[in-house]
């Protein structure tokens, strides 16, 4: 366990990752001094795992915060941090994977990543990030060649490990059929209102660590939901345990054997989020949470197309499998 109280998880490749990380998606302060200071503050209060992506447009501010943290002595070495970034869909082509990773490294001012993930199981026509993706730009991903390029990134030392995000069991099976280096992580939505039981069991059987996003319902994001934070079941457990609803939700995820990333720019909540490892939910608590109605918050609508690989949410998530 780290000095900040966050347990370390050993991934199937042997590298160690903090069980809790700070997410950097959908900030209202993109590219601002406030965003950089929030990341710097997170390092100061004890966060050592940061989750970013090319699509989040937060890499540069995070890189500046890391550089400043080193200058201030908040950390002695970049090696104290675990940095995850993600390959955007427009770069999910065999010849663009390595250049995309190298661009992320330039943004972050780092020599290597700890973990590089394929952001979504779909490709787009090459090009810059756009607010609205034209439907005719959505393409099927060649898992074999794209994953081989991800493997090359690891072999060359630009990332210590590779994984995926938003992959279903079916899509993981297809990718792993030709993989030489298996994915160590699958980052997906998971919370008391989306248990992901089948996917968790599949990933556990294949030594893939689930990292949960949207643990609190992604409140504030366009696709967000209040279902977690307004849950009467979670509220009752929180009162009984002397914890917040957020802490109960996060603790539930951790007790399922998953790691997690959460986002807050509020210092008090940053500190609160770190304090989920000092007590356990009881078997009775877990049973109550198992009965919470299930629904998905994340939407893949922006990656659906009548002419693309996935025409419906059900096809994208393989929810009818």
From Swiss-Prot:
Catalytic activity: codeine + NADP(+) = codeinone + NADPH + H(+); neopine + NADP(+) = neopinone + NADPH + H(+); morphine + NADP(+) = morphinone + NADPH + H(+); neomorphine + NADP(+) = neomorphinone + NADPH + H(+)
pH dependence: Optimum pH is 6.8 for reduction (forward reaction) and 9.0 for oxidation (reverse reaction).
Pathway: Alkaloid biosynthesis; morphine biosynthesis
Positions bound to NADPH: 27, 51, 165, 187, 214, 216, 264, 269
Enzyme class: oxidoreductase
Site (Lowers pKa of active site Tyr): 86
Compartments where found: Cytoplasm, Cytosol
Summary of the protein's practical applications: In yeast (Saccharomyces cerevisiae) engineered to produce opiate alkaloids, the expression of COR proteins leads to the accumulation of neopine and neomorphine as major products.
Positions of transmembrane segments: none
Cellular component aspect of the GO annotation: cytosol
Single biological process term from Gene Ontology: alkaloid metabolic process
UniProt-annotated stretches for the region Disordered: 299-321
Entry's EC annotation: 1.1.1.247
Temperature dependence: Optimum temperature is 28 degrees Celsius for reduction (forward reaction) and 30 degrees Celsius for reduction (reverse reaction).
Record keyword Zinc present: no
Disruption-associated phenotype: Plants silenced for all codeinone reductase proteins accumulate the precursor alkaloid (S)-reticuline at the expense of morphine, codeine, oripavine and thebaine.
Entry binding sites for substrate: 119
GO MF annotation, one: oxidoreductase activity
Job description of the protein: NADPH-dependent codeinone reductase involved in biosynthesis of morphinan-type benzylisoquinoline and opiate alkaloids natural products. Reduces codeinone to codeine in the penultimate step in morphine biosynthesis. Can use morphinone, hydrocodone and hydromorphone as substrate during reductive reaction with NADPH as cofactor, and morphine and dihydrocodeine as substrate during oxidative reaction with NADP as cofactor. Converts morphinone to morphine, and neomorphinone to neomorphine.
Name of the featured protein: NADPH-dependent codeinone reductase 1-2
């Amino acid at each position: 366990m780290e000095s900040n109280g966050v347990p370390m998880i050993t991934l199937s490749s042997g590298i160690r990752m903090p069980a809790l990380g700070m997410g950097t998606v959908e900030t209202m302060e993109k590219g601002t001094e406030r965003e950089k200071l929030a990341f710097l503050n997170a390092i100061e209060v004890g966060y050592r795992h940061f989750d970013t992506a090319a699509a989040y447009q937060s890499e540069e501010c995070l890189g500046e915060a890391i550089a400043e943290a080193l200058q201030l002595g908040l950390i002695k070495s970049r090696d104290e941090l675990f940095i995850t970034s993600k390959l955007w869909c427009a770069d999910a082509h065999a010849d663009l994977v390595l250049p995309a990773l190298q661009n992320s490294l330039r943004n972050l001012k780092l020599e290597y990543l700890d973990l590089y993930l394929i952001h979504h199981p779909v490709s787009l026509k090459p090009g810059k990030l756009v607010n609205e993706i034209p439907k005719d730009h959505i393409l099927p991903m060649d898992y074999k060649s794209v994953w081989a390029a991800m493997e090359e990134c690891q072999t060359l030392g630009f990332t210590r490990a590779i994984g995926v995000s938003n992959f279903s069991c079916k899509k993981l099976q297809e990718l792993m059929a030709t993989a030489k280096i298996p994915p160590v992580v699958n980052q997906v939505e998971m919370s008391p209102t989306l248990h992901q039981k089948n996917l968790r069991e599949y990933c556990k059987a294949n030594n893939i660590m689930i990292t949960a996003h949207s643990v609190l319902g992604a409140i504030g994001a366009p696709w967000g939901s209040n279902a977690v934070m307004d849950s009467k079941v979670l509220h009752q457990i929180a009162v009984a345990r002397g914890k917040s609803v957020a802490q109960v939700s996060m603790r539930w995820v951790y007790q399922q054997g998953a790691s997690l990333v959460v986002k807050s720019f509020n210092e008090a909540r940053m500190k609160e989020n770190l304090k989920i490892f000092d007590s356990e939910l009881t078997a009775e608590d877990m049973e109550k949470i198992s009965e919470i109605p299930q629904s998905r918050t994340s939407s893949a609508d922006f990656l659906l197309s009548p002419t693309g690989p996935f025409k419906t949410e059900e096809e994208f998530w393989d929810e009818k499998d």
